[in-house]
């Protein structure tokens, strides 16, 4: 979905302008979070780190198989467009160009929280130290998801002409539910960090 006459910004954003490209972006962000977890968790228990990475690898392998089987970005296009297919005009907007990566940083970032919690529960590792460690990942995901939702609402308001920033349709609700879950989780972790309670909620 790139085009030779488009600015570089839209050539790059055209990568995730279709279903296959957006799933590739999803895998890229998932890999990025695994790398960041490796860097930021060096002080944590080795078994906990290994088990967290194992759960993350299961997730990424599942997505990889799904992409190859159902949404392969390597399928041939015939006839080959000389200048490129180009991006849908409604998607040629700065807010929407950065909306998917930011939203994915929020969505995919929560996979680290999921894997870490599974690992910590399996090893009985949930403690104040673990709460301090996981809190930063919850906050990162929450911030990016918040920005992504706001960008999507602004774009929908002036581009689609819905007449408002928010409507209770499935497209918007599907991003609101994880945001509410992350907000609740963040507050539970704050309580866990200070009082060592609400472990079952976390």
Q: Which ranges hold each PLM region?
A:
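Polytopic transmembrane helical bundles with strong interfacial aromatic enrichment
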Residues: 1-202
């Amino acid at each position: 979905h790139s085009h030779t006459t488009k600015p570089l910004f839209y050539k790059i954003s055209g990568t995730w302008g279709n279903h296959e490209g957006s799933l590739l972006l999803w895998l890229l962000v998932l890999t990025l979070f695994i790398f960041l977890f490796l860097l930021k968790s060096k002080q944590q228990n080795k078994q906990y780190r290994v088990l967290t990475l194992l759960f993350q690898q299961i997730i990424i392998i599942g997505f990889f198989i799904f992409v190859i089987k159902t949404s392969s970005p390597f399928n041939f296009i015939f006839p080959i467009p000389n200048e490129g297919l180009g991006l849908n005009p409604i998607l040629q907007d700065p807010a929407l160009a950065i909306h998917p990566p930011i939203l994915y940083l929020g969505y995919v970032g929560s996979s680290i929280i999921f894997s870490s919690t599974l690992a910590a529960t399996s090893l009985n590792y949930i403690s104040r130290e673990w709460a301090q460690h996981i809190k930063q990942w919850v906050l990162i995901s929450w911030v990016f998801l918040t920005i992504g939702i706001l960008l999507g609402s602004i774009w929908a308001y002036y581009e689609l002409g819905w007449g408002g920033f928010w409507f209770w349709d499935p497209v918007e609700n599907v991003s609101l539910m994880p945001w509410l879950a992350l907000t609740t989780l963040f507050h539970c972790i704050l309580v866990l960090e200070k009082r060592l309670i609400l472990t079952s909620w976390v």
